[in-house]
Amino acid sequence: MSKVSGSNGGDSKNTLYCSFCGKSQHEVRKLIAGPTVFICDECVELCMDIIREENKSSMVKSRDGVPTPQDIIKVLDEYVIGQRQAKKILSVAVHNHYKRLAHASKNGEVELAKSNIMLVGPTGCGKTYLAQTLARIIDVPFTMADATTLTEAGYVGEDVENIILKLLQSADYNVERAQRGIVYIDEVDKISRKSDNPSITRDVSGEGVQQALLKIMEGTVASVPPQGGRKHPQQEFLQVDTTNILFICGGAFAGLDKIISARGEKTSIGFGASVKSQDDRRVGEVLRELEPEDLVKFGLIPEFIGRLPVLATLEDLDEDALIQILSEPKNALIKQYQRLFEMEDVELNFHEDALREIARKAIVRKTGARGLRSIMEKILLDTMFELPTLEGVREVVISEEVVRGSARPLYIYADRQEEKANASA
């Protein structure tokens, strides 16, 4: 029962308790009664959060049971700022891929081919995060591989089959489920051919890896040991068909913008010749003109590019986009640190100009959104060190001067109305 009688006086004589978390009616705002149980407002909110998360993963489906591109992009917008064109390309490609799988068993004259995806964009612009969010929306197994650790079979390093093994592990060794998963291969620009001409010596971590990836990306039955690698050659192998696995490759491709710009320049002589100024466009703007031939010049082999028919380029993030990333998404950095401070019963607030200064610092570092956390850690380090031992602090305020390093955070105490700047120390 959730009703307790006590002998400590009238207040505790008929105290009611939540049947789920055990809190009394005095500890919560509302206690809702059922036939034999009680539930508090906090447990109701928790249940609603769980239901919302489940609804998000299942989403509103189209007639064939696949999320529509509009549904996919709507959820992507909640987590990833900007990159509208890349989101549109991704949402259509993923929708078509899983629609193809939904109709695979039906008889038809036209066989739909798989469309793997190549993401190209500056570092820290959201390539990896887009792929992770996509897998969460579709609710399929997802794994991420680093192309720089891959080598040809027989050499020290990871085999490409290890990627399929990781996918199988994320599917709890359910082969059927793994065969519908998503694989994201990061840093794919680092496996480019070391020179334009085929070399007589083996390039085991560059072109060799591209050759090894061809078959699993196109579709093959990979033999995967349950415990990985070449360590247990005697054990029985699992057979995983990669035909329906969606491969997304991503890379920063530093210097690719120069290749694109050079292709766009046409030299002419004589009186009608136009004088070209140096291309001063941002990297993201130049990348919009990307063609497969540019990736071949960069060092990817034509067969590899042919397995990635969908090309999506991402913009480099400007100041406004970085400010949005700091504060707007559901798991924004500011919200994460505010939650951390809430655990100490302290409110954390940032001035608008402080956020702008943080964004400027990230742009100077050329690390994109990835550099925001390290900047935040540096700003809040001393405060997070001192806070657990300070008493009475109600609020911490971060200004532009604090971000620049010329001032300390402002501490506002609960037991005093005056504001105290922790300037000396």
From Swiss-Prot:
Keywords: ATP-binding, Chaperone, Metal-binding, Nucleotide-binding, Zinc. It holds the Pfam family ClpB_D2-small. PROSITE patterns: CLPX_ZB (PS51902). Zn(2+) binds at C18, C21, C40, C43. SMART domains: AAA, ClpB_D2-small, zf-C4_ClpX. GO terms for molecular function: ATP binding; ATP hydrolysis activity; ATP-dependent protein folding chaperone; protein dimerization activity; unfolded protein binding; zinc ion binding. GO terms for cellular component: HslUV protease complex. The keyword Electron transport does not apply. It comes from the Bacteria. NCBIfam families: clpX, PRK05342.1. This is ATP-dependent Clp protease ATP-binding subunit ClpX.
